[in-house]
């Protein structure tokens, strides 16, 4: 039996809460998450807007300190001193969804990619490093792009410049927040193929944050589905997306164009992280509970009153659902 590799980056019972205004309850944006990412692995973190996935990504990057739990990178707890974070962010780089907002319109492509090298005091050949990063990102010949400005590039080319700016520091892990959301459909596949190629060529790890389960299917080794601050289902992407067990995952999948049957329309109010309900946090919107299936399975009371608990961060198929566990 092949031993399981330890996680390169892991969240251990991470909580992130923001103070409420005018005496309101704290907003529990991340409410207890275990999640591991191994070397050379792409993990998709999926959920609708407001579920806490971007806040979790920011906590993993050290941009926001957890209010509970912690982050471990390469076997060591993440420290929040300036020097430690600077060293950490050389090894873990962020790729944002909007390349137009990420790139300074006054800077050339060369300066945009070289910025990280200058921040981290790179001592080698800067021009060679920039050229190699642009080439790896698919902008060839790289010298042709050195003096261009963002407005002279297509959306896909701008996103490749952003990726080159991350690659130039030779990171071990990328955190990509909706990396193709702002791109045309014709370009999305090219950027996803680029991320897969970088994983294969450089043994890069990646956390891809997205609301799109179709994107997760095309790029990820493993998927983690997030709802109201918690991971509610996780496992290898093929197993989770071909046989989803959590009603929320089923609802997300049902709206994909190729999904069989009618889309599942979730009732009730969108999740509010300052008012996490008792029991299963999805129960107020759960079609299984509303349709009587949970009652017939004998778990309706548990759905309303008993927290299913925090899933572990390993690669096994797991679900935080009383009804799924009873089947």
Predicted regions mapped to residue ranges:
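ABC transporter nucleotide-binding domains
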Residues: 1-242, 325-327
């Amino acid at each position: 039996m092949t031993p399981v590799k330890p996680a390169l980056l892991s969240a251990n019972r991470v909580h992130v809460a923001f103070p409420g205004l005018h005496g309101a309850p704290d907003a529990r944006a991340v409410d207890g998450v275990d999640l591991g990412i191994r070397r050379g692995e792409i993990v998709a973190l999926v959920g609708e807007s407001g579920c806490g996935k971007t806040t979790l990504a920011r906590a993993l990057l050290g941009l926001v300190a957890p209010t509970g739990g912690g982050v471990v990178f390469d076997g060591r707890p993440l420290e929040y001193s300036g020097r430690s974070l600077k060293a950490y962010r050389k090894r873990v780089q962020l790729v944002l969804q909007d390349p137009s907002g990420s790139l300074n319109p006054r800077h050339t492509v060369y300066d945009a990619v070289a910025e990280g090298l200058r921040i981290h005091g790179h001592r080698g050949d800067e021009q060679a490093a920039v050229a190699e990063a642009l080439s790896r990102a698919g902008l060839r010949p790289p010298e042709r792009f050195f003096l261009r400005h963002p407005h002279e590039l297509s959306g896909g080319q701008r996103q490749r410049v952003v990726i080159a700016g991350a690659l130039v520091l030779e990171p071990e892990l990328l955190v990509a927040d909706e990396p193709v959301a702002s791109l045309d459909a014709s370009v999305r596949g090219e950027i996803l193929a680029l991320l897969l190629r970088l994983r294969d060529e450089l043994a890069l790890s990646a956390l891809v944050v997205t609301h799109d389960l179709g994107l997760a299917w095309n790029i990820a080794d493993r998927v983690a589905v997030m709802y109201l601050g918690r991971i509610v289902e996780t496992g290898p992407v093929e197993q989770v997306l071909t046989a989803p067990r959590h009603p929320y995952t089923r609802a997300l999948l049902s709206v994909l164009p190729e999904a069989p049957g009618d889309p599942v329309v979730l009732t009730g109010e969108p999740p509010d992280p300052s008012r996490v309900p008792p029991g299963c946090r999805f129960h107020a919107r759960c079609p299984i509970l509303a349709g009587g299936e949970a009652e017939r399975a004998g778990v309706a009371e548990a759905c309303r009153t008993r927290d299913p608990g925090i899933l572990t961060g390993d690669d096994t198929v797991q679900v935080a659902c009383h009804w799924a566990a009873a089947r």
